[in-house]
Every structure is written in C-alpha cells, then in structure tokens.
Amino acid sequence: MTANSPIHVYSEIGKLKKVMLHRPGKEIENLMPDYLERLLFDDIPFLENAQKEHDAFAEALRNEGIEVLYLEKLAAESLINEEVRTAFIDEYIAEANIRGRATKEAIRNMLMSIEDNQELIDKTMAGIQKSELPEISDEEKGLTDLVESDYPFAIDPMPNLYFTRDPFATIGAGVSLNHMFSETRNRETLYGKYIFTHHPEYGGKVPMVYDRSENTRIEGGDELVLSKDVLAVGISQRTDAASIEKLLVNIFKQNLGFKKVLAFEFANNRKFMHLDTVFTMVDYDKFTIHPEIEGDLRVYSVTYENDKLKIVEEKGDLAELLAANLGVEKVELIRCGGDNIVAAGREQWNDGSNTLTIAPGVVVVYNRNTITNAILESKGLRLVKIEGSELVRGRGGPRCMSMPFEREDI
C-alpha cells in the first residue's frame, strides 16, 4: 500500500471523510434538443433548480461531517504557473478536434485572454459557441467549418461533468484516470490529469492504475471497492473487458493491497450503463440490486498468480458468492422497486439503485424513489434523502454525482 498518498478508499461503505463533486454550471444551459444524443442526455435540466438541488446535496454531506471538494476548484488550483496553464489550453483545444486553423486560433486567443484560472476552467467546461468568436471569413475557414456551418458550437459543452464518478476512480491509495466510452465525455478526464499531475496537494502523489491515453474504455461507475481485499468491476455499455484486464494487472503489480476482483457482465444498454446503476453496497452485508439484471448476470473471479491474471467463472447464488468474498455469514440483496416490475423499472430509471453510502448502513438517496426507499428503511438503513427532480434528468444518482477521496477503514 502507499502510505503517503492523499487518497484512501478501501471500501464502498467506510465513513466518508472527503468527497469531490461538480456543481452544475453553464454547460447545462448549452444543451439543446437537436443535439441531446450527441451529448449523452435525454432531457434538459433547469439549471437554477439543478444547482439548488446540488447545493442541498452538498450541504447534506457536510451535515454528516464530510468535507466537500469541487472538481472545478481543484482544476483551477492545478494551473500552478503560466507554462502549465498554456499546456492545459493547448491540450484542451487539441482534444476538441477543431480542424479549422482560423477557428482554432480564435479559440486559443479567447482562452489565453482569460486571466482568472477559475473563469478559464468554467469556460472550458461550458463550451464555446461560434457566436462568441470573431467573424471568420470563408477564405480562412477550413472544410469542417463550412460543412458544419449550422452547428452552433465551436467546442461542445461538457454537461455530464456533474457525474464526477466516471472520469476517474479512486481505488485504495491509487486512481484510475479513465478513457471513457464517448468522445463527448472523454474530454472530461483532462481535468483529472492536471489535478493528479500538478495540484499542490494531489499532483504526483497518487499512484496511477490506469491512464487516459489507453485506447480501451473504462468508466468509474463500473469500478467499486467492496473491501480492502476485493474489488468489483462491471463489463457494461461503457466499460470493456480489455480495459478491465489492463486495470487489474496494474492494481496487482502496484501492490495496493487487493487480492481479488469480481467482474460482473450484464446487459449492454443505456438503461444499465454502469454497474453502479444496478448494484451498490449499502452495509456490511447488504446491497441494492435491480432485479432485471439477475437472470443474465455472469460473474468472474480474477486473481493474479505468477505474473498472470487467473480468471474463473463463478456459478451459483450471487448472495452466497458475495458473502464468501466479504467474510460475512450472509448477504442480503435488496431489490430496487421490490417485487413490482413496473416500480422496479421506473425507480431504476430514476436511479433508485444508485445510492451513495456515507457510513455503514447510512445511505444518500433521491427522495423520489419511494418504494425502494421504504424497503431500505425497513431493513434498518438510515436514509439521507435529497431532492433530484432536475439532477436525475442526466440519468445519474448520488453515487454517480460523487467521487470519494477519503474513507475510514472498516
């Protein structure tokens, strides 16, 4: 294990001490109906109310004694000098795939003219409309500029940023800086790169177990830390098996303390985009699960022996498998929506299974999932309920919207 790392996350349920969020910003107001699919949204949240809901989420965490960090502030603090700042701007522009030379130059001039680091970061997150740039003559435009003349953005917004779980994942004392499923979201990982390279507190101090330069895809919603010995990973719409193999080899080689990984293979669709949308740990011996995945679920145990991954498909009951790997007598799987197929489908769509555990048996949930919440309370769990009518439009819940930096050991 790495004693000097400022990251310490060896479970899903240990008391949460420090967490990173992103307050939704102007990037949400750059959503428009014609391009929702391109930006991985199904609807457009009302920003003012989404911010109120997110502020209440952050305050609920603070009321539980949790220190709240913000991605946008950490990113701004990472631009520690002019050289780093310029490198960030150039890398941001390069990853936006702007092909028109004149357009690229105009964007660079705009960003370089922003003196305040926080304002710069916020602008890169919000995206840049073509109307914000000086008029460029047809002679100076590249072919892409002319072909996409009706498209309103010179650089797309990043509206998914408030789902901080996905661009990178904290695992033990390390971090997985992910290569994401879509080009739209993959640009988000640039902020993590600069935080873990240059930030005064985190830069160069956290072991990397996966790098964003890889060409296979993995996202944080598919990376769960069940205990100091066992990880769970999802093979899903957003994460492929090749990435998981790379991640696990790095984790085992860097001796972060983990002995086994359970790999969950389940339906590949947007409804079940990540493992944590259908399966989360809420107590020492309790998990939420969406009943629709149970029939087709396949689980593989992965260990590392003689410098090779050893992979075995597990057969039998999931609850028994989890109990054996967690060292508890029995595990209870709490089904989202109970036994009602309509309620289960509705509440899973509204992230009833996507809970954030902030201490053993203490769980942050959306208040709208009344059936699932009543079941959780009947099992003895204490729920911290938050409003999410606007936040949920992005298809993510409390776990999706949070990245733990520090938890107490269990």
From Swiss-Prot:
Q: Which reaction does it catalyse?
A: L-arginine + H2O = L-citrulline + NH4(+)
Q: In which pathway does it act?
A: Amino-acid degradation; L-arginine degradation via ADI pathway; carbamoyl phosphate from L-arginine: step 1/2
Main location group: cytoplasm
Q: Name one GO cellular component term.
A: cytoplasm
EC class: hydrolase
Instruction: Please tell me whether the keyword Cytoplasm is annotated for this protein.
Output: yes
Keyword Phosphoprotein belongs to the record:
no
Q: Which InterPro entries match?
A: Arg_deiminase (IPR003876)
> Which family, according to the similarity comment?
Belongs to the arginine deiminase family.
Under NCBIfam families, the record lists: arcA, PRK01388.1
- Identify this protein by name: Arginine deiminase
Instruction: Write the gene name.
Output: arcA
